[in-house]
Amino acid sequence: MAKQHFLVITIGAQGHINPARRLAARLIEAGGARVTLTVPILAYRRMFPSAAAELEPREEKDDGLLTYMPYSDGVEDGLDPAANPAEFKRRIAESLRCIAAGFVARGRPITCIVYALLLSMAAAVARDLGVPSVLFWIQSATSFAVNYHYFAGGYDKLFSEAAADPSFLVELPGLPAFRRKDLPTLLTGPRPEGTFYSFLHTLYGEVFETLRREVSAGEEKPRVILNTFRALEEDVVAGFEASIDMVTVGPLVPPSLIMTSPEETATNDLYEHDTSNYMEWLDGKEEGSVVYVSFGSYATLKEEEREEVKKGLSASGRPYIWAMAKGGSGDDGGGLGVKVEWCEQARVLSHRSVGCFVTHCGWNSVAEAMACGVPMVMLPQWTDQVTNAKLAEEEWGVGVRAEAVAGEELRRCLDVVMGGGEADDGGIVMRRRAKAWSEKAREAAGDGGSSARNLAAFVVGGN
């Protein structure tokens, strides 16, 4: 049997590239498949600064495990995707066809296209090529279910009612009840024509329209790879299995978090890692005493919100490390905390001194926190972050959601999570739950775990 060759395509955001790269690496490890990860040209140039300004049509880079290739989405030529979504999609589809043709010419034909969130045009390319395609859902299974019911399940009117009434409960099959504050913001917020929000809403809709057509065709169940693990969202996953092959492969976190002797691969991130001695700083702190603060690579705080976060951290009296993508490095808060521009989050979260994670609640961050057993204080901002916050607080019991970006509220939440250690301290229960979920996450992703088995089976049946 010929070796599988998966083409994994993702958009050029760090929060999308990270899980795509980890999935690609796991596919190789699970069954010896050949995997090519393709990213937009601008992201490729940032990941590989030595890449020529004028890329060759079949440019490839190898990091020792994966092969990387750039694709064109037009942004490198100044295209505004929100202003011209049709051209954005056309450029991507054309580029993917060229990539596939190049591999045929080199005797390494693509046998399956795995497309990440927002890139359903890849499914159309796969149909034209006569190869299967698989959606890679980089968010939670619950987020998948909410979006599916909105775009393809006929429940969109409930979301409109929630948008008009914050107290209205949206009840969807197999899911907890949601209020507006818990629902992905793209489904309830304003989306003026021609804006980025409208553009994203359209791309999400096309993903689920593609799935709806595949389900309706009834020839073979469409497959969706999910960055979650079975034990975490058992009922949600089971609720779709009659019509969709739900392949749980998570948590897709750095190998160091789930394996005793991992083989690390090159990071090739879009951002340069801070070279300050923050790990040495962590070494000097007591176990579980440090607050780690990061709002991801996309989420941003207004200046007044940053000041409120700083007030809350200072008022808590606990040492903290704050990763700020554009905030500078150095001492912050009179010696109580340090700021870094960009750090290796997995190393920080897994450090013995870190006892709490103040986070925007992006799914990658939630997955890494759960893998490390670190409870969270959550300040979600948009998209699925608000849904993740609800799940972490109410379903899994591993975090507290701040009601506002305010210093006193942040201090209160930190006290709840890190608490004083009394027998009735709710933080004790939360920390125990976080550790218990950490063990389940590692079990799922480790050798012989449910996610590892699913990956191996997927590689065998990839075409």
Curated annotation (Swiss-Prot):
Q: Which organism is it from?
A: Iris hollandica
**UniProt binding sites for UDP-alpha-D-glucose:** 345, 360, 363-365, 368, 384-385
**Name of a matching Pfam family:** UDPGT
Residue numbers binding an anthocyanidin: 16
Q: What keywords are annotated for this sequence in UniProt?
A: Glycosyltransferase, Transferase
| Reaction equations catalysed | cyanidin 3-O-rutinoside + UDP-alpha-D-glucose = cyanidin 3-O-rutinoside 5-O-beta-D-glucoside + UDP + H(+)
CDD domains the record matches: GT1_Gtf-like
Q: Which residues form the active site?
A: 16
Task: Give the encoding gene's name.
Answer: 5GT
The name on file for this protein is Cyanidin 3-O-rutinoside 5-O-glucosyltransferase
